[in-house]
């Protein structure tokens, strides 16, 4: 099997950053409402996170879907694990679970 450069990039990012958001746009200027919602949640919680814009690299978008087995964006990773997209992040935030997860892994 050939080595996938995007898989290596993804693995490196989620290994070296406690919180990573693969999103449409950037945290200062989200390009879709779903990405904007997750950025707003993370900002409300005061979390530093690595944002990676997937809009301009179709190959990265497709490889990320394969890597995560998750078909949509944004994709939120905490401590190397996929948490999910906008709906899951919102539900976890509203229940208080997201804050607990972030405190456990970002201290």
UniProtKB/Swiss-Prot annotation:
InterPro entries according to UniProt: Glutaredoxin, GRX_PICOT-like, Monothiol_GRX, Monothiol_GRX-rel, Thioredoxin-like_sf
PROSITE patterns cross-referenced by the UniProt entry: GLUTAREDOXIN_2
Gene3D superfamilies noted in UniProt: Glutaredoxin (3.40.30.10)
Transmembrane segment boundaries: none
Binding positions for [2Fe-2S] cluster per the UniProt entry: 32
A Pfam family of this chain: Glutaredoxin
Record domain Glutaredoxin: where: 7-107
Residues noted as binding glutathione in the record, renumbered to the chain: 24, 61, 73, 86-87
NCBIfam families: Grx4 family monothiol glutaredoxin
Protein name: Probable monothiol glutaredoxin 2
Native organism: Rickettsia conorii (strain ATCC VR-613 / Malish 7)
Annotated gene: grxC2
């Amino acid at each position: 099997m050939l080595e996938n450069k995007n898989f290596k990039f993804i693995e490196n990012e989620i290994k070296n950053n406690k919180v990573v958001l693969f999103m449409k746009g950037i945290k200062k200027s989200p390009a879709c409402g779903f990405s904007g919602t997750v950025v707003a949640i993370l900002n409300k919680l005061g979390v530093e996170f690595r944002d990676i814009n997937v809009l301009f690299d179709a190959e990265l978008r497709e490889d990320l879907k394969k890597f995560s087995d998750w078909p949509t964006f944004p994709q939120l990773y905490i401590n190397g694990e996929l948490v999910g997209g906008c709906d899951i992040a919102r539900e976890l935030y509203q229940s208080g679970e997201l804050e607990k997860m972030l405190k456990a892994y970002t201290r």
